[in-house]
Every structure is written in structure tokens, then in C-alpha cells.
């Protein structure tokens, strides 16, 4: 998706929004994690989105603060080694997904240095040995989400002044501070 197309879509929002606005991105069927061409497009799309938001912010009429990645697998299960029939090669897929997260975050940070990035589900979903009160409610284990998140964290750590990557904590069974303390 071109920067101009994304900019035009974002510009359809009312000007003068005074509250902080976060742009939600749903990743759906970006391609096999080993497909460099497909993931170059994904990375370019994120970079173009960051550039479009930055340009609109510079007009003074918009207040985009960041990007929220809804990384829940609604259709494609891009974060699951079983989906790629690659359980025996899962470590190499984790390495590739780590690099994909890092590349995306680097592209976004180059275009929008003060962006606030959040993923709705953090790396906990890659821990198949998580507590029963998480696993017991049907939250599946996705081998590759943690690697994607870690790659993004690495890019942030290499960028002076970047905001930390946020774990959106979309965990409907965690309500109290004690619940989160036990989990994390």
C-alpha cells in the first residue's frame, strides 16, 4: 500500500482531533515467514503508514500517537509453526519471525521516531508452559508471537530515545494487579 493511499485514508478522519489517536493494524495473511518478497511488502506497508501519519501530524491538524498491532490470528495463524507444517523446523521460523519484527520496527522508527507501538498480545502466547489459569481458558500457544515481539523490542533497544514497545495485555482473564503479577 503506498504512502499516499494510506495518507489519504488517514486524512479522512476529522481534522483537529485533540485526543491521542492510535492507528490499528490487523496482520492478515502476510505470507510465509520465509518469503522475503512478501515480508518486504509488509515492512514497506508499516513504514509507509508511519510516514503518512508523521506527515499528517506535521500539519498540526492531527494527533496520531502510535500504532497498535492487533496480532490476534483471526484467520491465518501466521504465528504458529504448525500452520507452516514446520514443527521440526520451528527454531529457524522463530529466527525468521524475530527478524521480521525487527525489520518492521526499524522501518517504523526511521519514519516516525517518537511513535508509540503496542501489540495486543505480548510474548506470553509463545510460552506453552504458562500457568493453567491462562492455558485453561483456551488461549492457544503460538510459537512465533514471542519472536516477533522480541525482534521489535530489539529494534527499539537499538534506537536511542525510542519509546518502549508496549504489551497491550489483551488478556480477558487477568483483571486485578495480583492476576498480572502472577502471570508476569
Which stretches of residues belong to each language-model region?
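Glycan-processing catalytic domains of CAZymes
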Residues: 1-184
Amino acid at each position: 500500500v503506498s504512502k499516499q493511499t494510506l495518507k489519504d485514508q488517514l486524512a479522512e478522519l476529522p481534522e483537529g482531533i485533540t485526543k491521542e489517536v492510535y492507528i490499528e493494524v490487523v496482520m492478515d495473511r502476510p505470507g510465509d515467514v520465509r518469503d522475503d518478497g512478501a515480508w518486504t511488502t509488509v515492512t514497506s506497508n508499516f513504514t509507509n503508514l508511519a510516514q503518512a501519519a508523521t506527515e499528517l501530524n506535521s500539519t498540526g491538524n492531527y494527533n496520531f500517537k502510535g500504532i497498535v498491532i492487533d496480532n490476534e490470528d483471526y484467520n491465518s495463524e501466521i504465528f504458529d509453526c504448525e500452520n507452516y507444517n514446520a514443527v521440526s523446523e520451528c527454531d529457524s521460523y522463530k529466527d525468521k519471525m524475530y527478524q521480521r519484527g525487527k525489520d518492521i520496527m526499524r522501518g517504523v522508527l526511521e519514519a516516525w521516531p517518537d511513535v508509540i507501538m503496542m501489540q495486543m498480545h505480548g510474548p506470553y502466547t509463545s510460552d506453552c508452559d504458562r500457568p493453567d489459569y491462562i492455558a485453561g481458558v483456551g488461549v492457544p500457544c503460538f510459537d512465533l508471537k514471542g519472536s516477533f515481539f522480541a525482534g521489535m523490542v530489539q529494534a527499539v533497544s537499538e534506537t536511542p530515545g525510542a519509546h518502549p514497545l508496549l504489551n497491550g495485555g489483551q488478556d480477558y482473564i487477568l483483571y486485578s494487579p495480583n492476576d498480572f503479577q502472577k502471570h508476569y
